[in-house]
From Swiss-Prot:
Top-level division of the source organism's lineage: Eukaryota
Organism: Oryctolagus cuniculus
Written domain comment of the UniProt record: The rodlike tail sequence is highly repetitive, showing cycles of a 28-residue repeat pattern composed of 4 heptapeptides, characteristic for alpha-helical coiled coils.
Function field: Muscle contraction.
Modified residues (Phosphoserine): S285, S334
Modified residues annotated as Phosphotyrosine in this record: Y456
Protein name per UniProt: Myosin-6
Domain Myosin motor: 1-35
GO function term, MF aspect, one: microfilament motor activity
Keyword Cytoplasm recorded: yes
GO cellular component, one term: myosin II complex
Amino acid sequence: ILERGDALLVVQWNIRAFTGVKKWPWMELYFEIEPLLKSAEAEKEMAAMKEEFGRIKESLEKSEARRKELEEKMVSLLQEKNDLQLQVQAEQDNLNDAEERCDQLIKNKIQLEAKVKEMNERLEDEEEMNAELTAKKRKLEDECSELKKDIDDLELTLAKVEKEKHATENKVKNLTEEMAGLDEIIAKLTKEKKALQEAHQQALDDLQAEEDKVNTLTKAKLKLEQQVDDLEGSLEQEKKVRMDLERAKRKLEGDLKLTQESIMDLENDKQQLEERLKKKEFDISQLNSKIEDEQALVLQLQKKLKENQARIEELEEELEAERTARAKVEKLRSDLSRELEEISERLEEAGGATSVQIEMNKKREAEFQKMRRDLEEATLQHEATASALRRKHADSVAELGEQIDNLQRVKQKLEKEKSEFKLELDDVTSNMEQIIKAKANLEKVSRTLEDQANEYRRKLEEAQR
């Protein structure tokens, strides 16, 4: 609303200013001159537009002439293009079959290279697994050595416990002897108590003290007997643990030996597979070279085959022309024979033939025989040439088919060897998985034995305390 109010004020101020100056003389003069200024500018613009129209018209005529010239060139170029397209199409039709065969051979080669690459990747995976297995083998050997060290420490601890047991047994024996002596003293004191009970009241107090002492010694005896039983139980437990550890140790050593033998067998299998893979790669490279040579030979044979086919077609055309000429000569001979017979009949009717006519007849007959022999020789020569070319063509086709069959047999052999190689790789993979499982089981048994040894060690420390 404020903006609209400001705008109204500005408009009102402009109108007020215009009404104030419109009656001035110079403003009236301006109003009269302004239309004249516009008409002068319009005439200048019209002259400029006419000049521009002339230039544009001249440019248009030049462009039209140039367009016609380009259209004529375009027609000629289109004609040449169509001719070239026809030639290219003809050449392309001739090359399609050869390109299809080459493409098929290239596809086969690419497939073989892909299969070789896949085998190489699998071999690299097997090598990585073998390296991991070797590292795990070293780790297992280290763990076995540590376990052996723990077993030796446990044996030293058992020997120490044996010594402590003997010392405890000696203490128990001494306490037993003391208890026997105390029993004798108690019996003696009891007898003295019964005999001197009335006379020795003070002795009763001493006897009560002695009984308290005996009770204390009895409790000590029971405690020592309990300790002896605990030590004997611990000793039996330690013996059992030692026997279990010995059995586990022997089992681990046997499993370790079997694992080492399996690893050696796998390394030998791996080395053999690597050698076979190198041999296969060499065979494949030779086969690729042979395939390239065969492809070049196939191209040469195809080129030669096309040349022979073209030559056969030319010879067949010549033979057909010779046959046509022979038919014409035969027709001419029959016409001449018929004419000769008619002449002979006329001469006979005329009453005889002159010597000139006889010579002419002989000359015609000789020329006819010569033409006939030349025609037969040419026909035989053309037929022999055509037969030789057909035989050569058949031999080339047979040779090409034999080479293709050889390539197919080599391909089937490689496919079979590839399948066998894949089965061997599967066997090696299965063996590696079994060894990994066996290793995991050994690690589990080792951890269990280590936990048991720690538990027994803790019990021994508690028993010693």
